[in-house]
């Protein structure tokens, strides 16, 4: 973190300035000579303009370039600390001014003659000449700048640029107006030479700040309308008449102001720091004293391409004292680093730490003073936080208990009874009672920071390893003023540390948390779009991630199997689709979808929270549910009923649902899920069907009923998310497919086909669903989403259908695969509520929610829907067919609502609902069971997407992509998911967003769903075998949905990134599609964008989905996202993602996808879009995710399990161990060259290699 040597910079500046002084005359002369040549060549009718332009631009650019660096050097030199002498500066400025004016006077004469000669030339030529002059002036500026005072140079540059500009304008004017030209030119020239002109003054003020800008503007001026120019010139002329004295005074005042600003800027302290990453690599960056830790964190997240998460923290490790502290977001980084000693071994580490905001994720564990951890409904958590932080004063938790206090200078510890109060920490002296008058102030918190001690059992013979340290930030060595306390267990440690933080920072902590939440959400909108979307394949992975091992394994297993069969059928479908899309439907629809999705996503975002539970329902409702509206909630469904509108509705409901899901996830997904599953189990089911009908509207209603339930709905979607899962499930899907069958004819040609085929099966599955319902975590299978595998059809279908039939068998497998990946444990638990918790960590709320659902495993949701409306389901399926995917959608939703959740808790996450949509075809099939949903059949436009979207409905396109093409993408997203999960709270948030997108999608997709049912059949067959797994992923997807499904849906879900839903969605879809070029073609137009934005696109995605292979390819393409997963949870990612990847991977690699003609349709456009989005969000996501996943283990520890840094942290070890061997080089100040960044690359690379 050493600062660069100022002397070196100063020398460079001095040399430059000397040369500059000498060269100024030469430069001007040379330029004028050039001008003469130019005019001559212009006279000879050869159009030189085009040729000259590029060189001109290059000149200007070079000038700007050098300008930028010289300014940087000057600032650095000033930075060295010496205060700048204003008088000396002004003297420099004046001397330069004089020099320029003398030079200018000569030049102006020359120029006048030139202008005369040129007057006859056409305007265009003048412009050219004008441009050249400009370039010349800018280059001369460059030189001038360095000369003299650093600031004066700046001003000079600005002046020169302005002058050149004015000269150009004058030249032009001269052409247009014969009489004025001469005068104008003269004036301008003079100005450029050094005389003051109005234009110049302004230019100096602006241009001094950014000569680059002015240069650019001057360049642009060339392109400005020639007619407009003259008028501008006239205005300038009118202004120029001001007397020279006035002008000089103005100019001088302006210069002084600029110089003062620069001086101020130059005196800002800047530090070059080295930040160590959790993967043992490190990054070097410059920070200035005005930057907060939050800003630096945002910077690092961008640079390291890791997914956004609340848990990313900057950790200060004081190796000499073996302690570490997580910097608070509002703190000033430079201030803290300046406390380090010059020879300090301290390190700055960028890593995920769940302890940072665990306080806000589970406030009941920290604010109530209870000894045991407890679950609490999200709403109650919010109320608790508001009571504590939003009142007139902050309520400091009254923590008290026995702690061990270290004796000064000894390695002995004694027990004392300590109490935390707002004013500080107190203790009861030996032999005294706990009476307020006997309390002794241990210390006040104003000037001390709280640190975690590391390995004090060895260092200080502490009774336990749970130590906290209180010291003044400037104490860097051993001191009697450092207080060491030891707790009996990790829970007590975290309670004390967080209590002290609350007492010290108060409301600022809560504000930091909300700010971080906003950033993460907005980032997720983006990433969910690009990376998530891109990673639709990933998304399945992500679900697996949630479930962790199970889902991973099963996923990969399923993926492998399904891919072949599904890939083939999918590729065929995708080809058909791609052709159809190529015909033009794609583009039109995608644009429409995009717009819709954009509008809807936001909508969904808003309602999400409450709707979450409904999300699932909404989907259901969306599909066939219309009839089912029976449930009162359906009222909202009414909107869904209109099949055409449904898509919108879906988006609405979906969005809400999605949003809701996210919320849950964020807060206490597990709790919510559990509650939801329990209450919702029963409640949910009925509502779900109704919801399905109302779908979009109802979703919200659903949520309310369940309150907690919201999370459950998402679970169903998970299946979808696990595109991989879905793929895997395809076989199982077959059974469930029937349900999905409904999927969506909308799917477009290809999807429709799939769905149609599957449709028949659909009916049967529904019954099964009911049976397996509860038991089967398999419900997940419902999610099965194998449909996704199948591409999109299967995923959705599987979701519903699978659960029923395969449910029992599949459940296990499914569970496993389903997104167990990340939360394998949850998977098994899926059925039971417990699962949710496991999932929760990773899967986020969704997972958690599903657990509640567990009562009624995913199947239960689906089953509930199915059982409730088993008969209807079938008919609904038919309806859904007409409606399209909606049914599918619905089904997924409903499972997510509660059932799915339980099983897939992790993946079940409500969000998944949306995921299903991606595999519209399947979802259609699946939804058939929830035929009610079919009703909403979203609008056909989205169908293609819709079908996949069904689940997602809103994000049909996305969904589809998720399932099929998206699937490919999804995989990458999955990593993201992982990261999300890892972040847990952070991730959760994002996920929720996705759900909203999903919701939107689902709205749109429903049509696809209903339509697709029959189509779904095709994929289903393949899926059936893997339904279980797929389902899992599907179910998980919901939870993951946010991750996996979301990925796929991401675009749609982008909702996941709440905002992004709208914004990001559109980009994501692109990225999503691009990944699976072949599929993309089909899905791309519709899905890509629509997916992101709305179900509309979904259809396209759907196309992609159908082809598992595509997914794989996509995955490859999105490999970067995969990388992310790698980071996140290498295992999880690898397993889940890999398995899914095979299926979805295709999607990512566009090239691989190419086979899918569909993608090829818009290869260019989508590819580009995807690429950029991918690059931006995916890479960011990917790396983040991978990183996150790595950290995940820690994060997983839910709450504050974070164990104190391991012994590695010990001073010596720490160096080597913490950051890895490099870390030892962790010095905050960067002494040597910046560390090599290659590792990060891998993230980006992540691609699908693995």
From Swiss-Prot:
Q: Where is the composition biased (Acidic residues)?
A: 1-23
Q: Which UniProt keywords apply?
A: Acetylation, Cell membrane, Cell projection, Cytoplasm, Cytoskeleton, Membrane, Phosphoprotein
Record-linked SMART domains: PH (SM00233), RA (SM00314)
Q: How does it sit in the membrane?
A: Peripheral membrane protein
The listed outcome for residue 891 to S is: In a breast cancer sample; somatic mutation
Q: Name one Pfam family in it.
A: PH
Q: Where is the composition biased (Basic and acidic residues)?
A: 588-597, 1238-1250
Aminoacyl-tRNA synthetase: is it a keyword of this entry? no
For the modification N-acetylmethionine, which residues carry it? Answer: 1
Q: Which residues form the Ras-associating domain?
A: 269-355
> Where in this protein does the record say Phosphotyrosine is found?
426, 456, 1226
Bias kind Polar residues: ranges: 552-570, 976-986, 1131-1144, 1151-1161
Q: Where is the composition biased (Low complexity)?
A: 202-217, 535-551, 651-662, 791-802, 948-968
Which parts of the sequence belong to the PH domain?
Answer: 396-505
Q: Where in the cell is it found?
A: Cell membrane; Cell projection, Lamellipodium; Cell projection, Filopodium; Cytoplasm, Cytoskeleton
Tissues expressing the protein: Isoform RMO1-RAPH1 is ubiquitously expressed with highest levels in brain, heart, ovary and developing embryo. Isoform RMO1 is widely expressed with highest levels in liver. Low expression in B-cells.
Where Phosphothreonine occurs, the residues are: 830, 974
Fetch the PROSITE patterns from UniProt: PH_DOMAIN (PS50003), RA (PS50200)
Biological processes annotated in GO: axon extension; signal transduction
Oligomeric state and interaction partners are given as:
Interacts with EVL and VASP and targets them to the leading edge. Interacts (via Ras associating and PH domains) with RAC1.
Q: Which protein, by its recorded name, is this?
A: Ras-associated and pleckstrin homology domains-containing protein 1
Q: Which organism is it from?
A: Homo sapiens (Human)
Organism lineage string: Eukaryota, Metazoa, Chordata, Craniata, Vertebrata
